[in-house]
């Protein structure tokens, strides 16, 4: 028989045991779980970005928890592991997409027990993984939240290099005060998400998915905004309750948009937009009739 308190306690304890054994590189990288004392009306399962950790969803997760919802942000496979990682000794990140897919499926099974409606979301490559789930299991998910999803990069030459080079890449912003993850990664570990992004765009043309909120920024130098729009337009045909928001260049919101330490000085815009979307039944047509400023100003 299902017992909510026992289940949530087990989720927390199992994650702690697993991460203690890694060992964890920084306490910020640990899985984040925010559980109400009883099953919640809404449950949010979030996937963090590439080489990063659950800390990216702390601000949004805390806002949703305060609104009365359950939040799960599990540490992804091969992430957050302590070690002296570099080009000669790269972090042990998966190079088989099935590792991430199985991970996502296991967590969706756990999360859907904890409330009435399940929302799945992700940032960057975590958004790619969430989009895959939205296409694979739309019947289990109420809505999907994609923040700067990595469907491909801004530069086609870089995409081509990602496809062919087996090298190690070090992040240019590795010294960012909001970064507690790896400073670099082996290119093949990113390639699998590039391939998945291409498949998601192709499948979106004829595969039903959940309603989606897709969030972009004109200052994002890592992802392709045109492909965010392409995905939105494809999903909108079947799911009229999908929304799209692209933050203006004047706001200088970078790809790392999920927290202020990572560079988003207008984080309230993202949080308020997300809360408005998950609590609304408005269609995109209705939003457009109200005026684009209804989203832009989160009124």
Where are these regions (language model features)?
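N-terminal cap/lid segment of alpha/beta-hydrolase-fold proteins
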Residues: 1-39
């Amino acid at each position: 028989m299902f017992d909510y308190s026992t289940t949530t306690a087990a989720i927390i304890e199992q994650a702690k045991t697993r991460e203690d054994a890694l060992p964890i590189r920084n306490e910020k990288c640990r899985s984040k779980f925010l559980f109400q004392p009883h099953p919640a009306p809404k449950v949010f399962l979030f996937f963090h970005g590439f080489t990063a950790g659950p800390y990216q969803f702390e601000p949004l997760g805390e806002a949703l928890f305060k609104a009365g919802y359950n939040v799960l942000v599990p540490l992804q496979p091969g992430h957050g592991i302590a070690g002296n990682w570099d080009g000669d000794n790269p972090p042990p990140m998966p190079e088989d997409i099935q590792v991430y897919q199985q991970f996502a499926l296991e967590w969706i099974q756990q999360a859907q027990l904890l409330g009435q409606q399940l929302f799945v979301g992700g940032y960057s490559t975590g958004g790619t993984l969430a989009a895959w789930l939205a296409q694979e299991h739309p019947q289990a998910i109420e809505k999907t939240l994609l923040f700067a999803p990595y469907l491909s990069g801004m530069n086609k030459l870089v995409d081509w290099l990602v496809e062919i080079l087996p090298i190690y890449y070090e992040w240019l912003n590795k010294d960012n005060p909001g970064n507690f993850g790896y400073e670099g990664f082996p290119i093949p570990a990113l390639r699998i998400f590039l391939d998945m992004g291409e498949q998601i765009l192709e499948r979106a043309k004829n595969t039903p998915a959940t309603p989606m909120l897709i969030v972009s920024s004109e200052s994002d130098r890592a992802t392709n905004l045109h492909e965010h729009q392409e995905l939105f337009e494809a999903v909108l045909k079947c799911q009229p309750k999908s929304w799209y928001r692209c933050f203006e260049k004047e706001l200088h919101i970078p790809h790392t948009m999920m927290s202020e330490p990572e560079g988003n000085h207008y984080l309230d815009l993202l949080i308020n937009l997300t809360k408005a979307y998950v609590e609304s039944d408005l269609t995109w047509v209705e939003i457009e009739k109200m005026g684009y400023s209804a989203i832009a100003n989160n009124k």
